[in-house]
């Protein structure tokens, strides 16, 4: 074993940078109808408005928080022990699961029995895996269709609302100042939601109904009780996914756990472990036991490792064992490329970039080697039986997505999409949750066609897209080329956006790349929420704009998506503490700040007892008299 891998098992420590609370923020918990429903949010405290701007208190702002216990100073974090099993009681009280005596997966048992892996193994609590009792179905969709509102659904409703109703009522009850603040913070431009059904308030019953219809999913494997329930759907806040994972060329278990904790700190709603290197099973165990967000995988990657990378040697039996292995570890959703059909493969021959999906290319090679449809397609109902025994959601993979804008919206891509719609119907027959993966590389004017076709052919199952990248000319900046497409398709109705880092197409991302990708995609998701008119989406923008106008620099930093970078950029040119209260920044300096000039006009108006328009006119008249008295010279000697 190498030193890094030995270290992770014996002396593993959490990344200190990932557990510090964000500046001027604290974790709060909102209790539901029972004491074990405690929903986390982040409260950002603000300073008072300076006397020169009216001297008024500014209320805290509440934002969605994906970081789990990591940013709670009261939590004891030890990644060797893992996180508390938040959902264990909810799962047990339903009475439809059984604890297995041992792992069901042959490969899982082999790994557990191999003493050479002891140095790598997660040392914390090893729970016996759970599985649905014979004849039972344990999916959130199954409960929803039976009219059951689960604790997970109530948790999600509280989480999505972000205390907005109570917050508004408390402001209105605080007298004239609070009423003014309520009007200012809650002002929001009407959006265009393209036929979505976003309510003013999310209720547990609304969550249940959306899951029952298949318009939203709750990724929550019964073997991942550590996860904090979240929802992916068109009528909820737009979510983002962060990809992590080792490769044959680098990274270690320690680095991947650090990437996970780093991802959720900055706002990753889910994390996909796309490991293709060594010790995939052990890496995944460490990640899941320490993750408060849903974990997704592409099981065919690990199955391929089991046959030494030879796609043609893959079998249904190997893949089935891999699904069970990962389901019993607690993976919450599987990307499965079951829509890559034999007849679609020739349609990629004239593409500029062919088949760019790893999973898609693996299955295409298998189909051609055996000249028949893939076992993912022919055994799809068997896969559904596994999914509903553990509540693993499908993320139906777009194995034929375009890898260049040249190939966008071609026959292969859209043919596969139609097949994914047909597979969705089969999964729903089993009450298995489904989301649909989407492109890819698509120029801006062709994005809406993708969204419209997906809604039509996949019956409004949540869409989950990689970008899309809107141009191919910017290697090193593909977080931006894709962020443009992500904001656009999120506005049109995509439920979750898969981040792209600056390293896309170039290399394995490091921690800084992960952060860049997440911040870019949080920005895209928020822009989409604003454009859709999602209730309350503009509160944070209004608070930050007010702080900016009042030169409350620290509040500006703290209300932003990345307080550290905002402060760093400000302090590059104005590092002194006095600059944190200055009425200007280094862009315009003290005499040309537009906001300072506007405030001067307001002060002048107040002194003169007139409105701002009259103040501007009076000011112009005063300056005209000064000009004439000084000799009416355009240029003066100074």
UniProtKB/Swiss-Prot annotation:
Subunit structure: Homodimer.
Cofactor note: Binds 1 [4Fe-4S] cluster per subunit. The cluster is coordinated with 3 cysteines and an exchangeable S-adenosyl-L-methionine.
Alphabetically ordered keywords of this record: 4Fe-4S, Iron, Iron-sulfur, Lyase, Metal-binding, S-adenosyl-L-methionine, Thiamine biosynthesis, Zinc
Residue positions binding [4Fe-4S] cluster: 585, 588, 593
Stated name of the protein: Phosphomethylpyrimidine synthase
Coiled-coil annotated spans: none
Residue numbers binding substrate: 243, 272, 301, 337, 357-359, 398-401, 437, 464
Enzyme Commission no: 4.1.99.17
Source species, domain of life: Bacteria
Entry-linked InterPro entries: ThiC (IPR037509), ThiC-associated_dom (IPR025747), ThiC/Bza_core_dom (IPR038521), ThiC/BzaA/B (IPR002817)
GO biological process: thiamine biosynthetic process; thiamine diphosphate biosynthetic process
One Pfam short name: ThiC_Rad_SAM
Sample GO molecular function, one term: carbon-carbon lyase activity
Residues the entry annotates as binding Zn(2+): 441, 505
Catalyzed reactions per annotation: 5-amino-1-(5-phospho-beta-D-ribosyl)imidazole + S-adenosyl-L-methionine = 4-amino-2-methyl-5-(phosphooxymethyl)pyrimidine + CO + 5'-deoxyadenosine + formate + L-methionine + 3 H(+)
Known cofactor(s): [4Fe-4S] cluster
Family membership noted in the UniProt record: Belongs to the ThiC family.
Enzyme class at the top of the EC tree: lyase
Role this protein plays: Catalyzes the synthesis of the hydroxymethylpyrimidine phosphate (HMP-P) moiety of thiamine from aminoimidazole ribotide (AIR) in a radical S-adenosyl-L-methionine (SAM)-dependent reaction.
Gene3D superfamilies noted in UniProt: 6.10.250.620, Radical SAM ThiC family, central domain (3.20.20.540)
GO CC aspect terms: cytosol
Pathway the protein takes part in: Cofactor biosynthesis; thiamine diphosphate biosynthesis
């Amino acid at each position: 074993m190498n030193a890094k891998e030995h270290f992770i098992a014996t002396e593993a420590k959490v990344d200190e940078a990932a557990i510090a609370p964000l500046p001027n923020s604290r974790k709060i918990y909102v209790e539901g109808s029972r004491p074990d429903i405690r929903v986390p949010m982040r409260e950002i405290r603000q300073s008072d408005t300076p006397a020169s701007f009216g001297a008024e208190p500014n209320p805290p702002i509440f934002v969605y928080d994906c970081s789990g216990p990591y940013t709670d100073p009261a939590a004891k974090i030890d990644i060797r022990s893992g996180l508390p099993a938040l959902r264990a009681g909810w799962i047990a009280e339903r009475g439809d699961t059984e604890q297995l005596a041992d792992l069901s997966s042959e490969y899982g048992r082999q790994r557990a029995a191999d003493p050479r892996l002891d140095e790598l193994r997660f040392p914390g609590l090893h729970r016996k895996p759970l599985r649905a009792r014979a004849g039972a179905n344990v999916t959130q969709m199954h409960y929803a269709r039976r009219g059951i509102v689960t604790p997970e659904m109530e948790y999600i409703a509280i989480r999505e609302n972000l205390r907005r109703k109570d917050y508004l009522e408390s402001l209105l009850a605080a007298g004239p100042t609070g009423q003014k603040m309520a009007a200012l913070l809650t002002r929001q431009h009407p959006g265009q939601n393209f036929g979505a059904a976003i309510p003013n308030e999310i209720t547990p019953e609304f969550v249940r109904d959306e899951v029952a219809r298949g318009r939203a999913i709750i990724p929550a494997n019964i073997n991942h009780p550590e996860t904090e329930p979240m929802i992916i759907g068109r009528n909820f806040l737009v979510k983002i996914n962060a990809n992590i994972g080792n490769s044959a060329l680098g990274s270690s278990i320690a680095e991947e756990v650090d990437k996970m904790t780093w991802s959720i700190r900055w706002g990753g709603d889910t994390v996909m472990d796309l490991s293709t290197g060594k010790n995939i099973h052990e890496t995944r165990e460490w990640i899941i036991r320490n993750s408060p967000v849903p974990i997704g995988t592409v099981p065919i990657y690990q199955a391929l490792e089991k046959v030494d990378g030879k796609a043609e040697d893959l079998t249904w039996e190997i893949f089935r064992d891999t699904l069970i292995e990962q389901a019993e570890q607690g993976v919450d959703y599987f990307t499965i490329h079951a829509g890559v059909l034999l007849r679609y493969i020739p349609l990629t021959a004239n593409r500029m970039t062919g088949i760019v999906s790893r999973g898609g290319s693996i299955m295409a090679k298998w189909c051609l080697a055996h000249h028949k449809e893939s076992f993912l397609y022919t055994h799809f109902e068997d896969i559904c039986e596994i999914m509903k025994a553990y509540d693993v959601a499908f993320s139906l993979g777009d194995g034929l997505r375009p890898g260049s804008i040249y190939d966008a919206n071609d026959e292969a891509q859209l043919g596969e999409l139609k097949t994914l719609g047909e597979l969705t119907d089969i999964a729903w027959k089993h009450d298995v949750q489904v989301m649909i993966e989407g492109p890819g590389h698509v120029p801006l004017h062709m994005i809406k066609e993708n969204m419209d076709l997906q809604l039509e052919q996949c019956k409004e199952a949540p869409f989950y897209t990689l970008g899309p990248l809107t141009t191919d000319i910017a290697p090193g900046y593909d977080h931006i080329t894709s962020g443009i497409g992500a904001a656009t398709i999120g506005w049109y109705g995509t439920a979750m956006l898969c981040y792209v880092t600056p390293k896309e197409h170039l290399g394995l991302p490091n921690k800084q790349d992960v952060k860049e990708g997440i911040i870019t995609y949080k920005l895209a998701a928020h822009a989409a929420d604003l454009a859709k008119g999602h209730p309350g989406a503009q509160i944070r923008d209004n608070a930050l704009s007010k702080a900016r106008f009042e030169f409350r620099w620290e509040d500006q930093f703290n209300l932003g998506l990345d307080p550290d970078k905002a402060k760093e950029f400000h302090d590059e040119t104005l590092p002194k503490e006095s600059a944190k209260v200055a009425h200007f920044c280094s862009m315009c300096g003290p005499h040309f700040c537009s906001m300072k000039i506007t405030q001067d006009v307001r002060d002048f108006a107040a002194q003169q007892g007139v409105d701002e328009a009259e103040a501007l006119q009076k000011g112009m008249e005063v300056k005209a008299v000064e000009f004439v008295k000084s000799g009416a010279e355009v240029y003066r000697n100074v």
